[in-house]
Amino acid sequence: MAVLTESELIQIRRHLHEIPELALQEKETHDYLLKIIKGFNSEFLTIKVPEELPTAILVLIKGSNPQRTIGYRTDIDALPVEEKTNLPFSSTHPGIMHACGHDIHMSVALGLLSYFSENQPKDNLLFFFQPAEESESGGKKAYEDGIFEGKFRPDEFYGLHDNPELPAGAIGCREGTLFAGTTEVNIDLIGKGGHAAFPQNANDTVVAAASLIMQIQTVISRSIDPIQSGVITLGKVRAGTIRNVIAGQTRIEGTIRGLTQKMILQIDQRLQDLCEGIARSYNMKVNLELNQGGYWPVENNPELTKNFISYMKNNPEVDFVETKPKMTGEDFGFLLAKFPGTMFWLGVGDPDSQLHSANLNPDEKSIIRGVNAIKGFLINRMGI
């Protein structure tokens, strides 16, 4: 198979868009990707499907004079969203959609892979088609399962995320944090239920929960550096069964978002302190569950990111945009905590929609523009 053309990449993207699958269920997507990859020039390609993560694909391109292995990651899963675009290539899987643009991500990766399979790079290139970015922390699972060992271990790692706010094909990046880290919060208050007329014989968890919720609102404003940024949102509270019975149990669910891992751990500790205080003050049991999984802040490596930005800024064919941090989460942050690297935005020119929207409709011109910009950077990075 020759280098994939723009029209071929668009057709691939449209087929991928038709077959979205949820985290760790990406069998049809995996098989379609593998069929395309096996059609590339295999002279210096090694393809690996890890048993530990069977919908993942690793492709290693052997360099002509390798000094390092450069990794490139793309995610492959979709979201439980009912598509409303009315496109002729809309999702054929009810209730599931590529509403975060991972079909664009995969198409760009295939474009890069097809080019370097025909034009042997100087350094080794490792392509990682990752399942389960939207949930289940596929990047963390891959690392902990040891699939990046031996010749499949990257010395540096790169990855993109589409951005509908940026023009099609524009590249956005910044030094420091690109995406926030996220942690799921579950708090269970366990007291004693009773008749509404006799509160002295009960232990009201609703009152305690109200106090705890108000105290949690002070964590960001009074415990976090105001120059930094963090968010705690408590989006769900469940308690009681009827108006005249004091609730013996209350559950609070929410999310933490922070721009550095240090900040997230600081917020975690403050929540622990507050929950312990409420437990003592109201004489009840308070269980706090914090689940970050692999959704660490995406903290770009300073040296590699300076190099990436410099190339993109000085390439007249690239529309480069210096971006601000986003409070959305991305599990590539876990991998960037293990390997130095850079994540960046690829504009897809759909400003009237947003990520995770049922109406997301990326401009397909972004695919070939993304391929060309990243291909140029990788060639430059290898010193060819």
UniProtKB/Swiss-Prot annotation:
The organism is Lactobacillus helveticus (strain DPC 4571)
Q: Give the taxonomic lineage as stored in the record.
A: Bacteria, Bacillati, Bacillota, Bacilli, Lactobacillales
Q: What does this protein do?
A: Catalyzes the conversion of N-acetyl-diaminopimelate to diaminopimelate and acetate.
CDD domains from the xrefs?
A: M20_Acy1_YkuR-like
Note whether Hydrolase occurs among the keywords. yes
Copy the pathway line from the protein's UniProt record.
Amino-acid biosynthesis; L-lysine biosynthesis via DAP pathway; LL-2,6-diaminopimelate from (S)-tetrahydrodipicolinate (acetylase route): step 3/3
Catalysed reaction equations from the record: N-acetyl-(2S,6S)-2,6-diaminopimelate + H2O = (2S,6S)-2,6-diaminopimelate + acetate
Q: Cite the entry's keywords alphabetically.
A: Amino-acid biosynthesis, Diaminopimelate biosynthesis, Hydrolase, Lysine biosynthesis
- Note the InterPro entries from the entry: AcetylDAP_deacetylase, Amidohydrolase, Bact_exopeptidase_dim_dom, Peptidase_M20, Peptidase_M20_dimer
- Write one Gene Ontology MF term: N-acetyldiaminopimelate deacetylase activity
Active-site residues from the entry: 75, 134
Give the EC number. 3.5.1.47
Q: What protein name is recorded for this chain?
A: N-acetyldiaminopimelate deacetylase
Q: Which HAMAP family match?
A: DapEL
Q: Which GO terms describe its biological process?
A: diaminopimelate biosynthetic process; lysine biosynthetic process via diaminopimelate
Against Pfam families, the record matches this protein to: M20_dimer (PF07687), Peptidase_M20 (PF01546)
The record's comment on protein family reads:
Belongs to the peptidase M20A family. N-acetyldiaminopimelate deacetylase subfamily.
